[in-house]
Amino acid sequence: MTEKLYEQDSMLKSCLATVLSCAEDKGGYAVVLDRTVFFPEGGGQLSDRGTLGGVKMTYAAQRGSEVVHYCERPLPVGVQVEAVLDWQARLDHMQQHAGEHILSHAVWKLFGANNIGFHMGERLVTIDLDKELTAAELEQAEDYANSQIWEDKPITVSYLPHTELSALVMRKKNEKLTGMLRIVTVADGDICTCCGTHPVRTGMIGLIRINRFDKHKDGIRVEFLCGRWALEDARRKNEYIWQAGRLLSMKPEGVPQGLRKLQEEVTGLNERLKAQTAKLYEFLAPQLLAQAAVDEGGIKYVAAAQEDCNAADAKLLLNKLLADGRTVAAVVYRSGERINFVVGSGEQTQADCRSLCSLAGGLFGGRGGGSQHFAQGGGAYGDDWRQKVLQLQQLLKE
C-alpha cells in the first residue's frame, strides 16, 4: 500500500520514500514506493511528473492500493529516494481542476446546468453540461466564477462518512460511493466529492477563461483554460490578432471587418476564375476530342494531362468531354507530390469506370474506386507522368 501524501497536503513538493518494488514495464520501469507526493492520473486529472532519486518519472497510475511510478531507469529495491514534483506541472493541473469545480458550480447555481463530464488534456480542458446555454449565459457564469477566484476563498479537504453526505448542499452526489468520502469545499461555494489535488485558496487559480462551446448530445461541451494555461493561450491569440492586423494594415479591432472584406474579394475572384476556367474548357475539350482514339463503333477514348488543376476543375473538364454520351475519358492532374485522376464514361458506352480506375491506378502506382460511370483515384508523382497519360488513353480503348 502506498501512503498518498498529496491527499492531505497538495502543496507538498517532495518527500523521502522507500522503494518497495521495481520491474520493467511499458518500455520503462514501474516503481512502487511506500509513500508518494505524486498524484496518479484519475478523476479527469492528469498525472503528476517529476523525479525519483534524480531519475525522471513521467507518469503515475493507480493500481489497487498502490501508486505505480513509471521511470526511465530502474531503482534498487529497499533504498530511500527523494521524490520531487515538477511543481509547475502540478500547479497547472491544480489550477485547471479547481477551476473546473468553480465553473461547474457557477453554471449549476446560475442556470441549473449539471456537469456530466470532465476531461483535462495538455492545454485543453472541457466540461460537458446536460443542458444548452447561450454565449451570454456562459459569459455570466465566467464572470461569476472569476469573482470567486478574485475573492481568494479557502479551498479545504475533509472526510465524511457516506451516510452523512445527504446533509450537504452539493451540485451532484454519487450514491454509489460508500465508506469515508473525500470532500473538496470552496468556502461559500462548491462542495464536491473529489480525489484530485487543488490549491489551498481560489486566488491561486488566477483566471478562468472560456474559449468555446459546441453542441454535445442534449447539452453543450465547454472548452476552457485556467491560470498559466489561460494566460499563455491569451498571449498566443493576441499575437495572432496583431499579426493579422499588420497583414491587413489595420488595428486589431478592425481585423474581423477586414477579414470579411477580404473573404468577399476572394469569393468574387474565385467566381471569376471559375467562369474563365469554364470558358477555357469549352475551347480545350473539342481539341482533346479531336485527338481521341476512336473504336469501330465511334466511341471516343481520351486522356488529358493537366498541370494547373484541382479536383473541381478536373471534374468540370471531364463532364465537358463526356457531354455527347459517346466518350470514355480520364483527366489526370498533378497535386504536389501526387498524381490524381478522374475517369468517366458516357451513358451510351459500355465501359466500366471501376475497371478503368484500376488500370490508371496500376499505371501511377496508386488506387481508387467509384461507380460504373465515374471513378477517381491517385498515385505517386513521377517525372514521366505525362507519358503515362498517353499510355492510359490507349488502355482506355483496349
Residue ranges and their predicted role:
Residues 1-79:
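Conserved nucleotide-binding/hydrolysis modules and their immediate coupling elements
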Residues 59, 116-120, 212-213, 330-334, ...:
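Short beta-strand
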Residues 30-31, 64-73, 125-131, 373-380:
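A generic structural motif
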Residues 193-205, 228, 302-398:
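Glycine-rich, acidic loop segments that terminate in or are immediately followed by a histidine
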Residues 199, 211-258:
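A conserved active-site cap/scaffold subdomain adjacent to cofactor or substrate pockets
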Residues 36-52, 76-127, 372-373:
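Active/ligand-binding-proximal structured segments within catalytic/core domains
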Residues 242-337:
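Hydrophobic helix-and-loop "lid/oligomerization" segment in the mid-to-C-terminal part
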Residues 89, 108-218:
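Functional cores that coordinate and move charged inorganic groups
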